[in-house]
Regions:
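Terminal targeting signals and extreme-terminal segments of soluble enzymes
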Residues: 1-141
Length: 141
């Protein structure tokens, strides 16, 4: 098993754990008023049979980063969703690959909130190079 180095400055152990992401730990995050950036070092448990980070992991953590970023924006605007958010739709374009040992970051670059919906876009990078772009729509509950 590969040991992960310390995360980049500003990142701490991810505050939101779930049974889905438990096997992918350690996962880190960085919070601001308008977004949550999630990151991890690519390990064997993150990869497909070709040694690249699996698209399912990329999609799941992009969804997580965008949803949490929507909550950050809504909360900063005094509209913290009591019931959280539910993903309505999500599209992802895979334009590169992450390999073992790379720092993979899920950074939400755009959030627009409405009364019942929140729209977000995220970019996924591997050591700073864009490998995926995701768009999602969330229902505010």
């Amino acid at each position: 098993m590969m040991t992960s180095p310390a995360p980049p400055q500003g990142f701490e152990p991810h505050f939101r754990r779930s049974p889905l992401t438990e096997p992918w730990e350690p996962i880190y995050s960085q919070r601001t008023n308008d977004r949550v950036i999630i990151g991890l070092y690519a390990r064997d448990t993150h990869t497909n049979s070709r040694g690249m980070v699996h698209g399912g992991l990329i999609a799941a953590l992009a969804d997580n980063a965008m949803g949490l970023s929507c909550v950050q924006v809504l909360t900063a605007a005094g509209r913290k969703p009591e019931g959280g958010l539910v993903t309505v739709s999500m599209a992802i374009d895979f334009i590169g690959a992450a390999k073992l040992g790379q720092w993979v970051a899920f950074d939400t670059q755009y959030v627009k909130t409405g009364r019942t919906l929140c729209f977000a876009q995220a970019f996924v990078t591997a050591d700073g190079d864009v490998i995926a772009r995701a768009d999602a729509k969330f229902r505010v509950t």
